[in-house]
Amino acid sequence: MALWGGRFSQAADARFKSFNDSLRFDYRLAEQDITGSVAWSKALVSVGILTQDEQLTIEAALNDLKLAVLENPEQILQSDAEDIHSWVETQLIAKVGDLGKKLHTGRSRNDQVATDLKLWCKQQGQQLLMQLDKTQQQLVSLAREHQHTVLPGYTHLQRAQPVTFSHWCLAYVEMLERDFSRLTDCLKRLDTCPLGSGALAGTAYPMDRTELAHSLGFGSATLNSLDSVSDRDHVMELMCTASMSMIHLSRLAEDLIFYNSGESNFIELADAVTSGSSLMPQKKNPDALELIRGKTGRVFGSLSAMLMTLKALPLAYNKDMQEDKEGLFDALDTWSDCLEMAAMSLVGMKINEARTKEAALGGYSNATELADYLVAKGVPFRDSHHIVGEAVVAAIAKGVPLEALTLAEFKAFDVLIEDDVYHHLSLDETLAKRKALGGVSPVQVEFALTNAEKRLEERDTSGISIRAARLTDLDDIERMVNYWANIGENLPRSRSDLVKAVGTFAVTEKHNQVTGCASIYVYDTGLAELRSLGIEPGYQGGGQGKAVVEYMLRKAEQMAIQKVFVLTRVPEFFMKLGFRSTSKSMLPEKVLKDCDMCPRQHACDEVALEFKLNVVGQTINLKAEKLAS
């Protein structure tokens, strides 16, 4: 179904339709389009276009559609709809009839697609932050393991000065830290909601756009409707951030490819990230790393194409802007894949420590130490540089390292050189001297490594925040509780019950959108029950359940409660958090009365578990406390 047919007297040519349609790639925005449509339906209630009952009908149908899409997104591609917006509207009308035709009131596909794309960028950006963090974690772990492994440092691909493998790892940790910072800043800048901007002049319906923005998890609404539908800065900025990061990943890949070569023989990559040759049986090729290096140009190309698309483009929406998605999707998918492969390539990598040390000792990499030695004796550096250059030439002619020259041979270059020169030329001393911040001395490497470990430990990449529930959260809580009750995982709870109990609830938020809940009920005996744990469908598996349970346990501990129990059909989840089996006979009588509301009361398959607070061996993850702050 086209959304614009009334103006036309004949159908579009099939070839034009194929050229014009975007469903084959913008189907990836289905979840975001449905989420935005639910929020828009609520805004239409506030301006009298929809009744409360109509909105609830539309929301229920859209939520059912979202679940179907999450289970099988490829089903969308079986449609001949023009784009994802047409597909969602067609599906909604099929479910609720003419009521679905009201949904697009006051909305344009211009502000709709801008909102969908920003929602997708926020979600994808959060995943990329987690992947950057994971790659950094792997580098730091490798750095700790090989803190004292010596490695030759290179300039111009010639041995220059000795470093450590740990120092090399930490160099890339810093590069990825800048990528993390850039992506974080980018996500802050795109945290504005265009919905309600209409085609270009704004919606004709006086809704609260700030409230609408907050309901979708945005920090604020955009401030100019014309800019809102024209803006694709966030697309370019994300691609630019991806391009910068791919440069870093490509350099890391190139280093490791060189270290892995037979000529270097510093490392051996794991079988899991290498492949063989169809002709040469002995080959073990670093394909994962070579593909990272090769795919870097692909990301650059997407950025270049987007810059050219937007150059000199008039304001408001132009069909050229349909070209924003394929390049963005591909660039961020590629970046994500390369981050995953980079982290995988670091796992199981073997370091040939004997070979790296041998290489670090070669190439006259201690020549700078001899120059510094002469400077300490009062020789100007430029003169000492020249003297050492002559000494290196003599050592090369003799076929020996610098430290193998005799004292008499050294004195031929400068009489100030004494027996202590050999100590200064040793590998350990060469490393130990680099004590300034950021240097390669063991002290500085330990300092940098400890700081990196602390920084990563304290960082929260989950995108989850937890807080006490408010009355304004009731719609979300009721929806989640009763969704899981309908499929038999929770006890059903009425609206009036939830209103009375809202003070016992906590909610989780992702991108300022409520996506999880749980409550705690305290009995006269001082025993507490964890109740109504629910996560928004489609958001499971992201750590929210664990986070909200830990938050509730912390709350119980602050109330001096000594034991929290739960009745559950998924005991494995709670046992991973420290809960232990207990007998239902030990539970308060009121719990058994509540079972009367359960549809499975005559064939109960719930397991009783308990968590004893302030008991050795059962501790609460303090991260829940951090998330709440």
UniProtKB/Swiss-Prot annotation:
Catalytic reactions on record: 2-(N(omega)-L-arginino)succinate = fumarate + L-arginine; L-glutamate + acetyl-CoA = N-acetyl-L-glutamate + CoA + H(+)
Chain residue ranges for the region called Amino-acid acetyltransferase: 500-629
Pathway(s) the chain acts in: Amino-acid biosynthesis; L-arginine biosynthesis; N(2)-acetyl-L-ornithine from L-glutamate: step 1/4; Amino-acid biosynthesis; L-arginine biosynthesis; L-arginine from L-ornithine and carbamoyl phosphate: step 3/3
Gene name of the encoded protein: argHA
Broad class of where this protein is predominantly found: cytoplasm
Protein name: Bifunctional protein ArgHA
Enzyme Commission number: 4.3.2.1, 2.3.1.1
Subcellular location(s) per record: Cytoplasm
Gene Ontology BP terms: arginine biosynthetic process via ornithine; L-arginine biosynthetic process
Regions that span the bilayer: none
N-acetyltransferase domain mapped to chain residues: 464-598
InterPro entries from the UniProt entry: Acyl_CoA_acyltransferase (IPR016181), Arg_succ_lyase_C (IPR029419), Argininosuccinate_lyase (IPR009049), ASAL_AGS_AcTrfase (IPR011244), Fumarase/histidase_N (IPR024083), Fumarate_lyase_CS (IPR020557), Fumarate_lyase_fam (IPR000362), Fumarate_lyase_N (IPR022761)
CDD domains: Argininosuccinate_lyase, NAT_SF
Single GO MF descriptor: L-glutamate N-acetyltransferase activity
